Amino acid sequence: MTPPLPARDDDRPELSLEDKFTVDEGIIHLTGVQALVRLPLVQRRLDLAAGLNTATFISGYPGSPLGGYDLELQRRRKLLEAHHVVHQMGVNEELGATAVMGSQLAMQLPGPRYDGVLGLWYGKANGFDRAMDSLRQANLAGTVRTGGALALVGDDPTAKSSPTPGASEVAAAAIMMPMLYPGDVQEVLDLGQHAVALSRSCGLWVALKMSTTVADGSGSAFVAPGRVQPVMVDIDLDGKPYVHRPSTHMYGARVMEMEHSLVYGRMRAALAYARANDVNRITLRGDNDRIGIVSTGKTYFEMRQTLRELGLDDRELQRLGVRLLQVRMPYPLEGRIVREFAEGLSEILVLEDKRPFVELFVKDELYGLPDRPLVLGKLDENGTWLVPIHAELDTVSIAKLVADRLLKRAAPGELPALQERLERITRPRSLAPLAMSRTPYFCSGCPHNSSVAGVPTGTVVGAGTGCHVLAVFMRPDEVGDILGITAMGNEGAQWIGASPFSSMSHLLQNLGDGTYAHSGSLAIRAAVSAGVNITYKLLYNDHVAMTGAQPAI
C-alpha cells in the first residue's frame, strides 16, 4: 500500500505549471522553446512598468527545432491573451514574415490601440532562407522605438529533422539583420530581452539563433525584474540625431535613403548597443596570456565543459596563459572587444560550427594591426583543415583542438595529465549491439500507412517533405522506387526538368496536405503549365507531426 503524502505546509507557496511563465523572481525550470514563450509576457510587464501600453504579434511557420513553439503558444493561449499577445500562424514562412512586418506599421494607421507592438517571427533555418525576400524588405522597412521585431530562427546543424543542415548566420548577414546567439536557457531569457531592446534602439529586426540543443534542451534559470537592464542607444546619421520611422514606400530615391539609414545609421547603432551592454564578453584573462579562444552560442558552453573534462579550470587556464572570449552577438561583430581581446596574444583559435563566420570578422578586425596574433579556425597555420566545417562541434572534437594547441606550446612532458585526459575523452567506445533493428515507420492509425502503399512494382515515386518521407526507408515493392525529395512545396517540379531527357513517361508524386496548403499548390500549377505527365497523390492526415502538428488545411 502506498503511504499517504505528508501534510502540506501551508506556508509554502502554491506551485503551478505556469510558474515558469509568471514568476517574476526566483529560479525556474523550462525548455528553450518555453523561454521564447515567456519572452513576450515579460516584455509586456516591463513595458507597463515603464509606462508603455504594448502588445505582441507572433506569426511564422513551425519547423524543428522550433516545431513545438506554436503548440506551446496554443497551450498558454489564455495567459497570452491576458498579456495582449496575438498568435496567428502563417500559411508559410514568407507570409508570416510580412504579417510581422505589418505589426511595425500599425502605429501609423488611424486609431492605434497601443503605444507599440512587438513582432515575433518564427521558423527553422530552411524557412528563414525561404522567407529571405520578405525578411529583407521587412528589415529595410525597420521597426518602431516602442515595438521591435525579432526573427526566432531554429538551426538544425546536423539535420536531425531537416532535409539539409542549418546555419542561419550568413543569411542574416546578407540582409544586414543583427543576430544574437544564446547558448543555454538562461541566455535565451537574457538575450531575448536584449534582442527586443536592440531592435527598438537600432530600428532593425534582430535574429535570435536557436540551435537544436538549446531549443529542445531544458535547464534552470534565474529570473528577476532587474536582471537585464538594457542601455538604449540613439541613432546618429550624417552627424545628426536620427529617429527611424518604419516605411514600406520602397521605390525610387526613397529606397536609397532607407538603405543609407540602414548602413550608416541603424547598423552603427547596433554596434553601439553591443558595446554599451557588454553583449560580447571576455570571460577569462590573466597577466601573461598568449593563447585566445573565441567561441559562440552553445559551442562556448560545450567548450567550457570540455575544458573542465580536460582538467583545465580557470586557475589552470590562467597558468597556461589562456584567454576566453564569448561572442553572443556574432553579427555585426563589435570590433573594439575583439581588439581588446587580441592585445598581447600570439595565437587565437576560433571555435564555431559550419563555415567560417566570426573567424572572418576577427581576421578583418585585426588585419591592419602591426602586432597581430595568428588567427586559426577552419585552417591551421599550414593551410590544412583544423576546425571541422561540417556537422557540429562536440566534446571530442573540441578536446582534440584545444589540447593539441596547448600541447604544441608546452615543453615535452609538461602536461602529462592533459594528454591522459585527452586520450580518455577521445577513446573509441564500443556500443552494445541492438537486439532488433527498428526501421522508422508511420504512427499506428495514420492514413499514410495505406495511402503511401499499394504502388505497382517498378513505379517511380517522388517523395516529399513531411511524415510520408519515411517511405524512403520502406520496401520498393510496397511504396515504389523512391526518387528522392525536393525543397518543401516544390514536389514534382523536378520532373519538369527531367522529363525531356528521359524515356520514362510518367511520375507519381507524393504531396502532403500540410505542404499543399503551405506552397505545394504552386508546384501543381507549374506541372500543369509545363504540360508534363505527372500524377499527384495528395496524402491527407490533418497533421504535420514531424514538425509542428498544426492543422494542415
Model regions and ranges:
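Short glycine-rich or small-residue beta-strand-to-loop segments that form or flank ligand, phosphate
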Residues: 55-61, 86-90, 118-123, 151-154, ...
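Gly-rich Lys/Arg/Thr-decorated short loops/hinges at beta-loop-alpha junctions or inter-strand turns
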Residues: 13-25, 51-54, 75-83, 114-119, ...
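Thiamine diphosphate
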Residues: 64-201, 211, 452-453, 460-546
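Carboxylate/His-rich catalytic cores and anion/metal-binding grooves
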Residues: 47, 53-60, 447-463
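N-terminal glycine-rich anion-binding loops that anchor highly charged ligand groups
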Residues: 35-51, 61-74
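Alpha-helix termini
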Residues: 44-52, 77-81, 105-113, 142, ...
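Flexible, low-complexity linker and terminal segments
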Residues: 1-39, 43-46, 182-442, 447-448, ...
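Short, aromatic/basic amphipathic alpha-helical patches
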Residues: 71-76, 164-168, 307, 361-366, ...
